[in-house]
């Protein structure tokens, strides 16, 4: 399984982007539009294995809810995956958001692709 690592600043930017996206306002800044696009692409690109689309959408929304509202896996209800898998998917989701926002450079993208 691949390891997805973000440094502290990248993680803070991604979490802020998700929180801003969860509280959409009428006026959108360039950052907000970029974040919304990156989040939509990350939701589509998240690899949660070969499961039904209904279950996949629940997992993706629980990950989004976990980041947006700071909720732990234990308080999210039925997530259709165990705790370890959930947090691995969450890391992957954050990495995809950061990558889609342009925070990840090519060198790090290649390192992540090697797995670990």
For each feature predicted by the language model, list its residue ranges.
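N-terminal interaction/assembly modules
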Residues: 1-53, 106-116
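Short, solvent-exposed secondary-structure capping/transition elements
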Residues: 72-75, 99, 106
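DNA major-groove recognition helices of helix-turn-helix
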Residues: 86-100, 104
């Amino acid at each position: 399984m691949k390891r997805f690592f973000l440094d502290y600043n990248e993680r803070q930017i991604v979490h802020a982007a998700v929180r801003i996206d969860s509280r959409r306002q009428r006026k959108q800044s360039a950052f907000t539009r970029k974040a919304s696009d990156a989040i939509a692409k990350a939701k589509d690109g998240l690899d949660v294995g070969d499961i039904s689309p209904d279950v996949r959408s629940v997992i993706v929304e629980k990950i989004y809810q976990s980041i947006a509202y700071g909720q732990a896996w234990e308080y999210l209800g039925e997530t259709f995956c165990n705790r370890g898998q959930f947090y691995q998917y969450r890391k992957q989701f954050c990495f995809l958001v950061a990558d889609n926002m342009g925070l990840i450079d090519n060198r790090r993208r290649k390192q992540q692709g090697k797995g670990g």
